[in-house]
Structures are given as structure tokens and as C-alpha cells.
């Protein structure tokens, strides 16, 4: 995890979000909470102030209390944020990986969560279901396979514990190998997430290919006025 840039701006934005009760003192939402935990850990690393690590740990405890389920973690606290998204869970696994640098129990929690969600979400040889029912009893109506979910899981699993999650990693790698050659991402968030993931294992074939392809797509999407189309 690299140090933050422009700390003053980050702190101003974080203070504003607190004042507006957006985050971390707003309603729980797993995607935002995962990124926020990583941000707080980065602030702790950069500024060496214990309050940021303490707040990250508080967010983790709140997520468990509010969104935690017998298997997995609900999408969000609002009534319409039911079900479970695999890519949200994968980002949460990454946040637990980051916190495991300070307390090994978070690696154990991450491994346990990965094992709990893997089988319900993953259809070997086909893909990773994008959204599941809240109890993981089956796919959420109207949802199929996610385009990047196998990549999400592969990266998060490997960062957490390659030995403990070896069978799950192998299944994700097989899915990646089957789809990476044909996958073309044209959506801005997807491009950003793919480029972020390629940094962790940059020499692997899928990472080399997708980094080149994603950067090329960004060049084609860039408009002279300074916007993406």
C-alpha cells in the first residue's frame, strides 16, 4: 500500500463527509466501507496517528454488526440494498488483508469469509454470479455472471493467503484464463478496477494483456475537453 498524496485535501474531504454524516458515520454500505477502511489504514500509515487505525477497526465492527450475515455480508443498510455482490465482498476481503498487517486475526477472518462465499457464488468452468440472495441460497432474480468478478476474487484470495485458499484460487484462475483473452472493458469504473488489479501480479499473462488493452481503451475514450466519453 503506497502512501497518500495531497493529505490536506483528503482530510478536508473526510471532515466534510463526517459533518454531513455521509461516512463513516452514515448508513453502512459495504463498497464504500471497504474503500474507507483502506483509506483510514493509509492515513494511519502516513500520519502515524492511532485514531485512524482505531476508526478503521470501528468501521469493521459496525459492518459485522449491521451487515454481517450467517454467510457473507449484505450489500447495504438501506432496505433496497439487499442481497450480496461478489465484487463488494472481494473489496472487503482486500480491506481485511490491509488490516491484517496490524493484526493477524483479520487474515483469518478474510480466509473464513472467502471460504463461506466462494462455493455459492462460483460456478466452475462458467463464471462468478454477480449478485446472490442475501442468505446465499441462490442467484438474485435477473442477475447472471459478473465480467470482472473472477479477477476480483483471484486477486483478493491470493493477497489474503495463497496456501489456505489454494483450491479457490485455482478455480478463479481457470475462469480468468478462459475469459481474459476475449474480455474488452468499455466502462470507466471497470477499467479503473482492472488497472488497479493488474498492479498486484503485473507479469502474469492476464495482467499484461488487460493492462495494455485497458490503457488503450482509455486513450480512445478520452476527449479533447478533458472528459471520458
Question: Which residues are covered by each model-predicted region?
Answer:
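Glycan-recognition and catalytic cores of secretory/periplasmic carbohydrate-active enzymes
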Residues: 1-229
Amino acid at each position: 500500500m503506497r502512501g497518500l498524496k495531497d493529505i490536506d485535501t483528503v482530510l478536508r474531504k473526510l471532515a466534510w463527509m463526517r459533518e454531513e454524516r455521509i461516512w463513516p458515520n452514515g448508513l453502512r454500505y459495504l463498497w464504500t466501507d471497504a474503500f474507507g477502511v483502506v483509506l483510514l489504514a493509509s492515513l494511519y500509515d502516513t500520519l502515524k496517528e492511532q485514531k485512524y487505525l482505531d476508526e478503521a477497526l470501528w468501521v469493521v465492527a459496525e459492518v459485522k454488526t449491521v451487515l454481517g450475515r450467517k454467510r457473507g455480508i449484505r450489500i447495504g443498510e438501506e432496505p433496497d440494498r439487499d442481497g450480496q455482490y461478489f465484487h463488494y465482498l472481494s473489496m472487503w476481503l482486500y480491506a481485511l488483508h490491509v488490516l491484517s498487517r496490524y493484526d493477524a486475526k483479520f487474515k483469518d477472518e478474510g480466509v473464513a469469509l472467502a471460504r463461506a462465499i466462494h462455493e455459492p457464488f462460483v460456478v466452475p468452468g462458467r463464471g462468478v454470479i454477480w449478485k446472490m440472495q442475501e442468505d446465499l441460497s441462490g442467484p438474485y432474480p435477473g442477475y447472471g455472471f459478473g465480467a470482472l468478478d473472477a479477477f476480483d476474487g483471484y486477486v483478493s484470495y491470493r493477497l489474503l493467503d495463497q496456501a489456505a485458499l489454494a483450491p479457490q484460487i485455482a478455480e478463479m484462475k481457470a475462469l480468468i484464463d478462459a475469459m481474459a483473452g476475449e474480455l474488452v472493458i468499455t466502462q470507466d469504473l471497470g477499467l479503473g478496477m482492472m488497472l488497479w488489479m493488474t498492479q498486484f501480479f503485473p507479469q502474469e499473462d492476464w495482467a499484461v494483456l488487460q493492462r495494455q488493452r485497458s490503457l488503450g481503451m482509455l486513450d480512445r475514450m478520452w476527449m479533447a475537453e478533458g472528459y471520458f466519453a
